[in-house]
Amino acid sequence: YNWGAGAKYKLSKRNVIQFDYSGNNYASRYKYLIENSGYLPGQYALTKLQKFHDAELKGIFGFTTNSTTVFGADYRCEVLRRPDSDLDKSVYTASAYGQHEVKLWNHLTGVAGVRYDHHEQTGGRFTPKVAAMYNIGNFNVRATYAAGFRAPGIDELYYHMFKKTMGTRATISLGDENLDPERSNYYSINMEYRTSRFSASVTGYLNYVKNMVTSKSTKFDDLPEAEQNRLREEFPEIGDLSSTKNLSVKNYFNFEKATVKGFEVNLNGNLFPGFTLAGNYTYAYGRGLNEGGEWQNIERSIRHTATITGNYTHSWSDYTLNLNLNGRLQSKVYYPGDADGNAPGYGIWNLNTRHTFDGFRNFVIEPGIGIDNIFNKKDNRPLNKNFALYSPGRSVVISLALRLK
């Protein structure tokens, strides 16, 4: 579950002070069907608990007619508890930032800002940002530079866990408290054309990352004998396995440097009244310099991704039909160095309909019916492989919403 609250105080028409708080609590538990590990049938054992708190105070000021200035402070706290990893940790990040946006001339807008983040475990860093937008008629051109900072996650720092996964697979995950935070320099340029019925945009980007946090998986049987013996002492669960053939060891580490470059194309058109067609294509080429001095694909990176959506809406008196057809297509997901190999690409299409009945005085009824995975695409490979498609196959989806007027 999650929750939040916020408040605004208007000093004047263009000057506002705002406070926002959000919280998130996620817990997963395992239900025992037979007596095991001291638990009776029907009892639950906590497997994972995550909490997130974010409090932000900011002021938005219009000091001049053509400018907007923002100052703010942000405090975030993350908590992760995993009994199977003897992990119960929390870390905080405190931040302060400022940004100034000004319209210099009729067609040119500039943005400059700076942010400071301090992470409890890895320290802090200033990150500047500069952007400019030029617009004339239906055309917009944007250029952006932004420095970035990301501290390693609690799992990447502290995991020390044995876990059975799908089928006969098992994984030992080992975090590293000495991981360095990521630092990046991001450059992009965007060109956009927009009318009342059609829009198109192209964005190209380069992202240079130092100390990118990644991981590698090694088969337990491929480790030196001394390393195997050490892990057997630390994780007695290994002795319960019938074989270590499908046991992997996952270690987190820093790339010395990494580069992600690519482009994105978006098209959106209203072809005739009530019908909209939209498409997106993304190309991303991500490589990192590993510990052996070799460049490799970034783990879980996807080279090609495309989405297509067609939406039709029409009303007859008190009834409105909404028909949506959407598809997602992607190439393989890279798992470099993983003995279980890459996850193959896939294409999934879904059809959804929503029917709105507005002939009632106090409420509106909206039943819906659709088909997910129309062409019944499934990945039926053995469970000890890496997967990108988890769909069980074609399924019918039914919903009902009641809205009060």
Language model: regions and residue ranges:
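Gram-negative outer-membrane beta-barrel transporters
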Residues: 65, 70, 103-107, 206-208, ...
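Outer membrane beta-barrel strand-and-loop segments of large Gram-negative receptors
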Residues: 42-58, 95-97, 180, 195, ...
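Conserved C-terminal beta-signal and adjacent last beta-strands/turns
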Residues: 146, 276-283, 297-405
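Outer-membrane beta-barrel channels and translocator barrels
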Residues: 12-14, 62-66, 105-109, 135-139, ...
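Transmembrane beta-barrel strands of outer-membrane/channel proteins
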Residues: 19-23, 71-77, 112-116, 132, ...
